[in-house]
Amino acid sequence: MAEDIETKVVKAKKASIELSSVSEEVKNRALEAMAESLDRERKAILEANSKDLEYASELKKVGKLTQALVDRLKVTDSKIDGMIAGIMDVIKLKDPVGETLSTLELDNDLILYQISCPIGLIGVIFESRPDVVPQVMSLCLKSGNATIFKGGSEARESNRTIFEILVKAIESTEGMPKGAFQLMETREEIMSLLSLDAYVDLLIPRGSNEFVKFIQDNTKIPVLGHTSGICHIYVDEFADPDTAWKVCFDAKVQYPAVCNAIETLLVNRKIAEAFLPKMAEMYIKAGVELRCDKDSYILLAEKGLSPLSKATEEDWSLEYNDLILSIKLVDTIKEAIAHINTFGSHHTDGIITENASRRKEFIGLVDSSSVMVNASTRFADGYRYGKGAEVGISTNKIHSRGPVGMEGLLIYKYILMGKGQVVADYAGENAKPYTHRKLDLKFADVN
C-alpha cells in the first residue's frame, strides 16, 4: 500500500515540473474542458452523492458525523452550477506564473529579476465537501501546481466521481501532462502522505479543528490552513440598528455550518436594550439557540424572550458550526477587542458602527485575517473576494493569510542576467560598486 502511494506521489512530483511551464492557452483549454465535463456528467455526480448521503445518514445516527458535515456533503444542481462558475472565473484570471515581481540593476548589464513560480506538489486533505475538488484543482492547474487529493470517507463516491471526470478532461487536453493530479482514498494513505516530505511541498488541510491540528502535529511538510473559525461581530454603541440586525442575522443564519459564520455576538451595553431584544427575537424565530452571559440573559428574560441558555466559559472558545450563538455584553470597544483576540481564531471578525474612530481602532487592533465593517463575516471567501475560488482560509502569519486563492499557491525565484560578471570584480580594495537601482523591466521582455 505504502509503495503504491509513493509511486503516485513521485509521478505527480515529476508531472509538476512539466506543468509549471504549460502555457496559459493550454491551461485555459483544460479548464474549459473541466467545466464542460461537470455540466455533462451531472447525473453521475448526483447519483454518486446520493450514495454518500445514505452512508452519512447512518454515520450521523451513531454519532460519527455531525449535521454540519452532512450539510457540507450534499451536492445539488445549484452546487454543480457553482463549481462550474468557479472554474470559469479561474479562466478569466491572468496566468500568475512568470510574473515579474521586481527588477533590480546590480550594475550595468547585471540585472536581477524576481519572478513568480508554482510551489510544486501540493497535498489537499479535506472533509465532507466534494466541491473542494473542482475548486482546488482549477486553482492548482492555473497556477501550475500538481496536486494530491485526499477526501473524507463519507464523501468517497462523490470525490472519486468528480475527480475522475475532471482528470479525464485535463489529460485529454493536448499539451497537459499526465499524472499531475492524484487521488487517495484511505486513512492509511494519509499517514503515508504525511511522511513524504521529500516530495510534497505544501499541505492544505480543510476540516475540523481537531483534524487540522492532527495534520500539523504529524508531518514535517509545511501546512497552510486554520484550525477553527470562531468569528465575532461587535455591535458598537454607535451602530445603526437596522444595519446591525440585518448583518448579524446573516452572519449566523445564512449558512451556520461554515467557518465564517459568527459564533459570538458582542454588544455594547449602551445599545443593548435598544438592539438586543429584537435581534434575539429574530434569532429565536430562525431556530437559533442563544447562550447568554449573565447580563444579556437577564435583559432578554425580562423582555419575556425564550428559550434562553446560560453561557459557560467554554462557550467563548467553541466553534458550533450550527444554529447556536453565544452573546456577551461589553462596556467598551477595548473590552470587545480583548475578548476577540483572546477567544477568537484570527479568522474573521466584524464591527457594526457609524463612528470613524471606533472603526479605525477595531481594524487596527483586531488580530484577524479578515475584518468586516458593517458587513457580514460570511463575505470572507475566496470567490467573493474575486479570487475565482479558494484553496482554503489561512490564519497563519506566513506569505498567505485570509481566503487563499492562486496567489497563495505561488512562490518566487530570482533570475540574474549578466554578461560574464564575476564576484571578484566587486570585492577587495578596488571593488566595483553596486548600483542597486530599481528598474521597470519585465522578464518576459528579455530576449
From Swiss-Prot:
Record GO terms (molecular function): glutamate-5-semialdehyde dehydrogenase activity; NADP binding
UniProt superkingdom: Archaea
Main location class: cytoplasm
Matching InterPro entries: Ald_DH/histidinol_DH, Ald_DH_C, Ald_DH_N, Aldehyde_DH_dom, G-glutamylP_reductase_CS, Glu-5-SA_DH, GPR_dom
GO biological process terms, semicolon-separated: L-proline biosynthetic process
CDD domains for the chain: ALDH_F18-19_ProA-GPR
Example of a GO cellular component annotation carried by this entry: cytoplasm
Subcellular location: Cytoplasm
Keywords: Amino-acid biosynthesis, Cytoplasm, NADP, Oxidoreductase, Proline biosynthesis
Catalysed reactions listed for this entry: L-glutamate 5-semialdehyde + phosphate + NADP(+) = L-glutamyl 5-phosphate + NADPH + H(+)
UniProt entry tagged with the keyword Ligase: no
Associated pathway: Amino-acid biosynthesis; L-proline biosynthesis; L-glutamate 5-semialdehyde from L-glutamate: step 2/2
EC number: 1.2.1.41
Family label: Belongs to the gamma-glutamyl phosphate reductase family.
Function: Catalyzes the NADPH-dependent reduction of L-glutamate 5-phosphate into L-glutamate 5-semialdehyde and phosphate. The product spontaneously undergoes cyclization to form 1-pyrroline-5-carboxylate.
Descriptive protein name: Gamma-glutamyl phosphate reductase
Species in which this protein is naturally found: Methanosarcina acetivorans (strain ATCC 35395 / DSM 2834 / JCM 12185 / C2A)
Gene responsible for this protein: proA
